[in-house]
Amino acid sequence: MPINLPSSLSPDSWPFDLELLTPPAYLVGGAVRDALLGRRSHYFDLDFVMLTRAVKTARKIADRTKGGFVLLDAERQIARVVFAGGTVDLAQAEGGSLEGDLLRRDFRINAIAYNPFTREIIDPLDGQTDLRLGVLRMISRSNLEDDPLRLLRAYRQAAQLGFAIEPETQSAIRELAPLLSRVAVERVRTELGYLLSNPDGVPWICRGCEDGLFSIWFESAIDRFDILTKIDASADKLAAIYPQLGKEFGHQIRDTIKTPLLAVAKLAILADSDPTMAEAQLLRLKYSNAEIKSAIGLLKYLPQLQAKPIAEMSFREQYFLFRDVGIVFPVLAVLAVAAGVAVEDISLLINRYLDADDIIAHPTQLVSGNDLMEYLKLPRSPRIGQVLMEIQLARVEGRIATREDALKLAAELVDVN
């Protein structure tokens, strides 16, 4: 029977006219599920199942709306239209019918369809009951075997929706966990990224480790659950004391890399505590150089913050710490607190970091390499870089303060050598 779904599913809110769809066409998957749960998103992600002409319809929509057309799978007839605010995917029904297509999906809550022409819900597996119960229940074990990434997706969706995983489904996931070795690491990394970025993701990461889902990539992750499970609370604690620091926890490593700093901190703790081993693990998952470098910096310096009182760190040690960890220092502070370092102790470094004029945390050059070459009449060489480093260290240790001091020291260093 016709129903009143939230306005987010009304064709009036879509980036194209309903008349551009060739009936029968059905909205399926997450958009329907989230509408029934009353969940809203600023980014739309609409998936349609069609019995015929899926790719042609996608191309027609793209042409009429000036959207971007992407052919995702010519053989299975799947195409995407890209808009500024989201995406619309159109796919030919697998199994030759809507019901056949729904029966091939992962979980019952994702096997609900909506007919926008009749405003009817089609729910052959009673996924709406699971929505009311707040559970993820597999459609069949064989569906999970067909695409083992669905094993990880269960944990991600449980975290995302605040749902539980039904016991029989949980048991099947544990048994099928070794099949994840067949999945492209890029797909695994995407699902793990969702969990790392979700404030409710850590308990599900821990359960996933216990159930064998991550043992292929992170063999010893369980050993550091004591730190991992305290990261979010430690971040909240520091953000309450240092609001400016807290704002940076969600910053991306780079504009082109969407991983938040706090997610990198969690990733570092999942990886081996030995930086060399951790680097190999992260390379295997094809993380970017920036993500790997950041995680390794955290792993390198966290033990140092635990080993002795921070107040006993020399200016030289502090300088190299800030230089090496760079923009991920805010989450190094989080990891330190999660690992048992007192907030009062780490505050020495936090205050330096938050002071833009602090020459240890944010050093500036008294002289440049060109200045040295001109003043000392030296050619370009690695020695110039070495002298610049000695000047910087002398400055942070309070032995020099001006440009003249720097040039005098440079001359002395060159004469000595």
Protein language model features and the residues they cover:
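Catalytic cores of the polymerase beta-like nucleotidyltransferase superfamily
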Residues: 1-417
